[in-house]
Amino acid sequence: MSISSLSRKNIQALTPYQSARRLGGKGDIWLNANEYPTSPDFNLTHRTFNRYPEPQPQAVIEGYANYVGVTPENVLVSRGGDESIELIIRAFCEAEDSILYCPPTYGMYAVSAETCGIALKTVPLTADFQLNLPEIERQLTGVKVVFVCSPNNPTGTLVNRTDLLALLEMTRNKAIVVVDEAYIEFCPQATMVTELKNYPHLAIIRTLSKAFALAGLRCGFTLANKDLIEVLQKVIAPYPLPVPVADLAAQALQPAGLQAMQQRVQEILQNRTALEADLRSLPCVENVFQSDGNYLLVKFKDGQKIFKTLWDQGIILRNQHSALMLENCIRITIGTAEENRRVIEAIRKIA
């Protein structure tokens, strides 16, 4: 008997999420994980490594609450946004329940549900990467949690606000709606935070991994009404944030840290505009999809060839060819101006 055969049946059948690091690669240009290209500079100020950390570090909770304009009771901090996804599924889904999500989108919604033994329902996005609301409404029976990513990863599109409000109305008293705003700093006007007061079943996922350039910290947040946060507090690990992580996260949420984040956002937006224009000039490019994130989804005439050739040159992008509706598509994280120049130069040589 193998050890694997002793594991739960759903785990035996599970295909793990293929993160950028799991997929590997060797090179000096990494534009496959929607990270910021350089690291911010912080120094540890707390060195009480012999003591367990605060269950919910006050400086982090208050700093993030002030940043987004809510009260501390509306904030839960976790080990990245991925833990928020799993917490919500564990806290709200019974064995007979389902989650619903809309591909092509972030893969961890499905993986987290499958890990917990929860069934999946999918309603693909429309041709313009928006919600298919009539079909979602038809599929809601037995659904306890609906996940929507806006801006959506990997397409970069914002979900129409009117559609999100319609979704919240049709799920009232039926299901939790989770809006994943991992990339919202690149389009802050689109946040759903102002709707928390109107919808007790709305949860919003945030992170320090993208615009804050702190992917290595693994620090995320759930924003929701007090009652929903209290449910999640029942199932979260006792000490989710190590002392060094809480220390650096709190610094990032101070005025100087927020100003640096906003400067990074402006830099990324400028580089995104330039990269988009350069990509559109290439004959091998069929489409560059409009993006509100720190990445571009690009459809090539032969995406597989482009991806493999650049991979072999040490330029690591994210292949989306196998994702629903994304044949020959590659997602390109916005890098430095020099990194973007090298991407264009490499693609131009192939074409």
Swiss-Prot record:
Pfam family of the protein (one): Aminotran_1_2
One GO term of the biological process aspect: L-histidine biosynthetic process
Enzyme class: transferase
UniProt-listed InterPro entries: Aminotrans_II_pyridoxalP_BS, Aminotransferase_I/II_large, HisP_aminotrans, PyrdxlP-dep_Trfase, PyrdxlP-dep_Trfase_major, PyrdxlP-dep_Trfase_small
Cofactor: pyridoxal 5'-phosphate
Annotated metabolic or biological route of this protein: Amino-acid biosynthesis; L-histidine biosynthesis; L-histidine from 5-phospho-alpha-D-ribose 1-diphosphate: step 7/9
Disulphide-bonded residues: none
Keyword Transmembrane: no
Modification sites for N6-(pyridoxal phosphate)lysine: 210
Catalytic reaction equation(s): L-histidinol phosphate + 2-oxoglutarate = 3-(imidazol-4-yl)-2-oxopropyl phosphate + L-glutamate
Keywords: Amino-acid biosynthesis, Aminotransferase, Histidine biosynthesis, Pyridoxal phosphate, Transferase
Annotated GO MF terms: histidinol-phosphate transaminase activity; pyridoxal phosphate binding
EC number: 2.6.1.9
HAMAP family according to UniProt: HisC_aminotrans_2
Subunit annotation: Homodimer.
NCBIfam families (alphabetical): hisC (TIGR01141)
Family per record: Belongs to the class-II pyridoxal-phosphate-dependent aminotransferase family. Histidinol-phosphate aminotransferase subfamily.
Protein name: Histidinol-phosphate aminotransferase 1
